[in-house]
Amino acid sequence: LHILHLASGEGVELIRAAKDKGIKVTGETCPQYLMLTDEDGERLGSAMKGYPPVRGQSDQEKLWEGLMDGTLSFVCSDHAPHLPEEKRKPLWEAPAGCATIETMPLVLLDSVAKGRLTLNMLVKILSEQPARIFGTYPQKGAVLPGSDADFVIVDMGKKYTFSQKQMHSRTKLSP
């Protein structure tokens, strides 16, 4: 059983309890749930509308705890590239979802820079764990002889400012 797009601390607790009982279950969350809280709603409006909705600070902390202790297996993009004019509609009319495929690595690398994650943990949650869970490891998710050479080189000493103008997605709007 795989539970996707966890946004609540209660969901993390349910997965943890199931694992403690020996139930084979995995779960993941998305960058918006790790980086935003319901307090960002006034500033971002419909841009952060998603299903499930972004929750409070305590839920966010439990998501981080679940990610760090292995209760949650990885972070996925849940990329939903709606046009800016669609996302600027009133909350109940705007489509749900965020354009996160381009920003996910950046916000998680920022978490590495701030000491919340290690680079090794980042590799595990973005590459190794998804490959293991979905049966593509070690062809994917590993740097080993015979594996696909899918990797990214980053310079953690270099400062980088992301701009919406740099986005390649259909939308140039990402929380």
Can you say where each PLM-predicted feature lies in the sequence?
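A short acidic, glycine-rich active-site loop
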Residues: 48-58, 95-99, 173-175
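Short amphipathic alpha-helical segments
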Residues: 15-16, 87-89, 165-166
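Glycine/Thr-rich phosphate-binding loops of Rossmann-like dinucleotide-binding domains
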Residues: 11-12, 35, 83-85, 162
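His/Asp/Glu-enriched, well-ordered alpha-helical/loop segment
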Residues: 74-75, 80-156
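A structural signal for short secondary-structure junctions
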Residues: 67-68, 144-147, 169-170
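Histidine/acidic residue-rich metal-binding segments in metalloenzymes
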Residues: 2-75
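Short, glycine-/Ser/Thr-/acidic-enriched flexible segments
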Residues: 8, 32, 80-82, 158-159
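Short, surface-exposed loop/helix-turn segments at secondary-structure junctions
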Residues: 91-92, 161-175
